[in-house]
Amino acid sequence: MDQNALKEQTGKESVKYIKSGMIVGLGTGSTVKYMVDELGKQVQEGKIKDIIGVTTSNRTAKQARDLGITIKDIDDVDHIDLTIDGADEISDDFQGIKGGGGALLWEKIVANASNKVMWIVDESKLVHKLGAFPLPVEVIPFGSQHVFDRLEKKGYKPTWRMDGDKKFRTDENNYIIDLHLGEIDDPKALADELIHMVGIVETGLFLNRVNDVIVGTPEGPKVLHAR
């Protein structure tokens, strides 16, 4: 099976965990797109009813609305029952790097408001230690070059996330700097260091935030219980 087939398998499998009446966090990314497509199909067929979606990006919101899924702003709900999202890397101890799609800030806010968080990935995303995938940090535009320079001095090998010939803009109109770290020995210490740097809004380190992971494999979807 190719990677897209594994993503589709995983996305469809995750919809089995969505029940009628739920408030569901809808993530962002290529695997989540398959999940939202399947959810929309089941909503249209009347198999899942009265659900509300809270999205982690404007593009997921558009996709969901086009499929007939009711969408509400996160501040218009008091909780989220289940959030289903992708991940760029998941370590052996279920820590994650997210933000390859540029939605890390909204993703973390939605995850924090959720009773349960599920990540859906193909098996290529499972790693022993985090760090091979570039770690995104979201920065406000004002003074962002100074933040970039500080990260460079620390040896974190920063690069600007680009959108064509311009700097990529998040849904909050911020920039993203990707850090090429190779391997992260202490994710918590790194997260604490980065979040205390003035100008950094959020990091792509998602630590102790996931409950279950569905992994797409050639033998079929596999569910891993994190906590």
UniProtKB/Swiss-Prot annotation:
<keyword id="KW-0413">Isomerase</keyword>
<feature type="binding site">
    <location>
        <begin position="98"/>
        <end position="101"/>
    </location>
    <ligand>
        <name>substrate</name>
    </ligand>
</feature>
<comment type="function">
    <text>Catalyzes the reversible conversion of ribose-5-phosphate to ribulose 5-phosphate.</text>
</comment>
<comment type="pathway">
    <text>Carbohydrate degradation; pentose phosphate pathway; D-ribose 5-phosphate from D-ribulose 5-phosphate (non-oxidative stage): step 1/1.</text>
</comment>
<dbReference type="InterPro" id="IPR020672">
    <property type="entry name" value="Ribose5P_isomerase_typA_subgr"/>
</dbReference>
<dbReference type="InterPro" id="IPR050262">
    <property type="entry name" value="Ribose-5P_isomerase"/>
</dbReference>
<feature type="binding site">
    <location>
        <begin position="28"/>
        <end position="31"/>
    </location>
    <ligand>
        <name>substrate</name>
    </ligand>
</feature>
<feature type="binding site">
    <location>
        <begin position="85"/>
        <end position="88"/>
    </location>
    <ligand>
        <name>substrate</name>
    </ligand>
</feature>
<comment type="subunit">
    <text>Homodimer.</text>
</comment>
<dbReference type="InterPro" id="IPR037171">
    <property type="entry name" value="NagB/RpiA_transferase-like"/>
</dbReference>
<dbReference type="InterPro" id="IPR004788">
    <property type="entry name" value="Ribose5P_isomerase_type_A"/>
</dbReference>
<dbReference type="GO" id="GO:0009052">
    <property type="term" value="P:pentose-phosphate shunt, non-oxidative branch"/>
</dbReference>
<feature type="active site" description="Proton acceptor">
    <location>
        <position position="107"/>
    </location>
</feature>
<comment type="similarity">
    <text>Belongs to the ribose 5-phosphate isomerase family.</text>
</comment>
<dbReference type="GO" id="GO:0004751">
    <property type="term" value="F:ribose-5-phosphate isomerase activity"/>
</dbReference>
<feature type="binding site">
    <location>
        <position position="125"/>
    </location>
    <ligand>
        <name>substrate</name>
    </ligand>
</feature>
<dbReference type="Pfam" id="PF06026">
    <property type="entry name" value="Rib_5-P_isom_A"/>
</dbReference>
<protein>
    <recommendedName>
        <fullName>Ribose-5-phosphate isomerase A</fullName>
        <ecNumber>5.3.1.6</ecNumber>
    </recommendedName>
</protein>
